[in-house]
C-alpha cells in the first residue's frame, strides 16, 4: 500500500503542472477555480467582520485614488490574461495604521491598509508598484501554487506515516491547503510578482523607476527590521539590482502616448467593490 500511495502521488505530480506568465513551471494540485472559491469565502468573511467594526475606509478621496490606480492596473492584467475578465475584481482600504501591507487573493480580491499609505506615503507611481505586485500574485496563480505545495508536503508526510489510509492522506492534505491561504508567498513567487508587477504598472502609465524608491521606503518602514510585507521578499540588494535592470526594459511601455484605460469598480456601501461591464477611459 505504501508503494501504491507513492505511485499515485508521483502520477499526480507529473500531471499537475502549469506555467506562469513568466514561463516558470508550477506545481498545481489545487485548481485555480478552487483557490478562487476558497479565497472568496475568506474575503467575504473578513470584509464583513471589518465592516461591522467600522474598519473599512469610506473617505471618497482615498477610495477614488485607490480605485483609479487599481482600475488602470486591472485593465493591463486582463490584457495579459484575458480569462481574468471574468474575475470579480474588488478592492478595499482597511483602517489599520499599524499595518504596512497590501494583498490580492486568487480571483482579484484586493485590500491595502492605511498604515501603508501613512507610513510609506507613496506617490501614485509607487502605490501602483505595490498594487501591481499584489495583482501579479493572482495573475500567476500563486495562491493555488502555495496551496498545492502545502498539499504535497502534507500528503507525502501522511503517505509515509499512514500509507494504508488514503482518506487520511487526502483529509490532511486538504487541511494543509486551506491553511496555506494564510501563509506568505515564497521568494520565488515574490521575485516573479516583481517582474510582472512592474510591467503592469508601466503599461498602465506609472513610472517604473518608482519601484526602486518604493522598496527603499518599505525597507525603512520597519525601523530595526523590515515590515511584515517584506518578510519573504528577496534581499534588498538583489531586489534593487533586478529592478534597476527591469526599469530600462519597461520605460518604453511607460512612455507610450495617449490615455490609459481604467476598469470601473462600482462600490456599494460597506461591501467589496464589484465590477461594471466595461472599462472606461480615465
Where would I find each of the regions flagged by the language model?
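Metal-dependent nucleotide-binding catalytic modules
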Residues: 8
